[in-house]
Curated annotation (Swiss-Prot):
Keywords: DNA damage, DNA repair, Endonuclease, Hydrolase, Nuclease, Restriction system. The gene is vsr. Its EC number is 3.1.-.-. This is Type II nicking enzyme V.NaeI. It comes from Lentzea aerocolonigenes. The keyword Oxidoreductase does not apply.
Length: 166
């Protein structure tokens, strides 16, 4: 079964079980599926800037943390155990720019709430497994995002514990 058909089957099961409400129409569903999960402009810009500085990383690298927990950060520094996520303001409910949609609130409110809860769970799972988690909002200035990643890597490379700085 292809990846696309397995996603469609999983979506159909979720709709049938009531886990996720069915889309209102096929056109809207198609539009939402076209939204990128990875390779967004903020991700590409951050990756490019880090690469130019000489940092090497894995992109969308699947981490298996045990107990069936799988996580796929946007940027992963495997040797240093640093996971970087670039979060979209809408999808991850940015406190500055995240807005609740006014249409189909019955659908969006629980969905966005689940996204935020999943982010918390992922952060905790990674931390428990000894990983350092960095979350960058898509609206953050590129130089600030680069500085946050570089500072974390620098501190870890030189034996400083940065966990109390969050």
């Amino acid at each position: 079964m292809s990846d696309k058909s397995s996603r469609a089957a999983a979506r159909a099961r979720a709709h049938a079980s009531g886990t996720y409400p069915a889309p209102l129409n096929a056109g809207r569903s198609r539009n939402m599926q076209a939204n990128r999960r990875s390779g967004t402009k903020p991700e590409a810009a951050l990756r490019s800037a880090l690469f130019k500085l000489g940092y090497r990383y894995r992109k969308d690298f699947l981490l298996r943390l045990g107990d069936g927990v799988k996580v796929k950060p946007d940027i992963v520094f495997t040797a240093r155990k640093v996971a970087v996520f670039i979060d979209g303001c809408f999808w991850h409910v940015c406190p500055d720019h995240g807005r609740q949609p006014t249409t189909n609130e019955w659908y969006w409110s629980p969905k966005l709430r689940r996204n935020v809860e999943r982010d918390r769970t992922v952060n905790q799972s990674l931390t428990n497994a000894g990983w350092r988690v960095l979350r960058v909002w898509e609206h953050e200035e590129l130089q600030d995002a680069v500085a946050a990643v570089v500072d974390t890597l620098h501190h870890l490379e030189h034996g400083f514990d940065t966990s109390a700085e969050d």
